[in-house]
Amino acid sequence: LRADVIASTWTVENLQTLISEGALSALMRDSRLPALVELAGATDPAAVLTRFFILGLPERTSALNEALPTLGARGLESLGLAATIDEAEASSALVMPPAGGAPKREPKEEREEASAPKASSLPTMRNPDEESPEPEVEADPWMRALFDLRPHAASLPGGDHEWWVASDLAEVQTGKPLSDDHVLGIGGATLTLLEMTVREHVDSALDVGCGCGIQALYLATHADRVVATDLSSRACALTQFNAALNEAVIDVREGSLFEPVEGETFDLIVTNPPFVITPDSVRGAAGLLEYRDGGMDRDNLIRAVLRGAPACMNEGGTLQMLANWEIPADRNPD
């Protein structure tokens, strides 16, 4: 996969030549239509991969084989990044979504069918050349992406980097509600933390709540040792996948906050925790997203981070994070 995306010149710079500034801006606002129109009929590899992974459009197996000549469509399926679909599903996906976007989130038990792929379909590092049963399919079947995958460019003091980052598909790509364990891609808060983080060389760095692993990828450019933790097994799997795809050495551990690194210390800790404060009135209700809700009342998650970080920091170490905190109505904020 890495060799193919490099050969395809599917980079941020190339993406900006394929799609106009206006269409890219619309895409940031969850509007695919301008980009869909501009890429309609384009056959070069970067355009095919953009339609497939970023816009969420089905593609024919033959088109994916041409875009990824080494891995091929069968290899994508073997890695858990794509699935074969029938003509009916492809036709419905090719129809433009309604202006209203995805349907309203329903109670968990009523929307299991609509949720994103679960752990059984996480991306894998399995060798796509391994033999596997080949079902009888049509000559050139349709395929759909199971994950968002897109290029990301980083200009850092140590040099420029071009990465490809996988995350869960968003509502705009699927037309379906997000699953509770949805792993977010690179959003505005993520970019804010990336920009504010000190990029001096350090011996060790820790990313708490790693999500798709983009903070850890940045840390790996200026830290000799990087550990990434997350309570979500799905987030850990995606971080491991992205580290392998981008040839980064990251020690990924599943667990809550600092529990996976108990007894260890670091020079730099970064965290973009689920800092949205969930009102008590909806606490415990179905449909709370893990990446937004940390599972603790009020701002107790942020309190836990601030109290737990010092024990994991070397002398002179740094903690950089984003946070919200609650100001009770009966307390003077000053």
What are these regions (language model features)?
Residues G101-K118, L122-E134:
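A cross-taxon signal for low-complexity, glycine/charged-rich
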